[in-house]
Every structure is written in C-alpha cells, then in structure tokens.
Amino acid sequence: MNRRNFLQQMSVLAALPAVSLMWPLRLAAMGINPAIVPLNKPHEAWRGLVAPEAYRILFEEQTEEPGSSELNGEERDGTFICAACYLPLFESRNKYESGSGWPSFTQPIAGHVGTKADYQLIFLRTEYHCARCGGHQGHVFKDGPPPRGERWCNNGLALKFVLQTESLSALRN
C-alpha cells in the first residue's frame, strides 16, 4: 500500500463518525422519528409473515381495489398498525370517510411514516411507507379536511386494527 492509498483510506475512516451523526438528520428530513430503528430485513423475508395479497401491497407497491377493505367502515376507538412489523401508524380519531374507497386519515402518528416521490402514474404523487419495515402503505393527497388539508389514503391490507381496549402487538422483527 502506498502512502496516497493509505491516506485516502484513513480519511474515509475519519469521516465515519460524522456520517453516523448525520443519520438521525436524514431520517428526520424524511419525516421519520430517529428513535424508530429501521429494520435491515430484505423485503423477501416478509413473504412468509404476511398474507400474499398484503405482501404485494407492502413490498411490491401494488394497490388494492377501492371499497374492498373491511377497514373502510371501522369506526371504533383504537390504533391502526403496519400489517408487517406492527408499528402503530394511525390513531382512529384521525380516520374519516373520504369517499375514495380506501381507509383515509387526516394525519399519521408523527414520525412513524416516511415519504418519497412517486412517478408511477405520469404525475407526481407522494407515497408513504412504514418507517420501520419500509412497507408501502399508500399515498398522501392535499384534498383532506381542515385544518391540515391532507388525506392519507391507505391500503386496508397494509394495516391491522387494534381496539383501544386491547394491548398493541409486540413489534415484529
């Protein structure tokens, strides 16, 4: 190893602490709570843990048919959790009937979802996913009720509902 290569490698090592300190800032910029540790689990590993239809939505970013989810009519008090890793994503008090055919919410639990640009349909949409397992949940639109004006439109198969009187499931790895 010559001196130049040695110095280059040492400069990379010296930068590692700074990069690791920036990771929480990157998560926060994506709207993710830095206290939620993303799972380092390949999507394929979830195949045996969730139903095939849920897998297609969560990890292949498919969309269920509008009006097909039993969660559309869910009005009881409770929490909607990710169907893959069980991270709480929405509180029932933020659910409303949007007329879209999908369970809709005015806001997620702060820091429990991340967003990204989605160009699958020619125009730009904002896709959101579970901050922990990365499972696709749905899209957020700017046509919701006041005061936020947001409609978090979720695939019902990407969620599970837990009644307020029941204990939340332990997070699944």
Go through each PLM region and give its residues.
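N-terminal secretory signal peptides and thylakoid transit peptides that target proteins
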Residues: 1-17
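Mid-length scaffold segments of soluble, non-membrane domains
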Residues: 75-104
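Short cysteine-rich clusters marking metal-coordination/redox-active sites
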Residues: 82, 130-133
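Cys/His-coordinated zinc-binding microdomains
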Residues: 86, 134, 157
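Short, non-ligating residues that shape and space the ligands of small metal-coordination modules
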Residues: 91-92, 139-140, 162
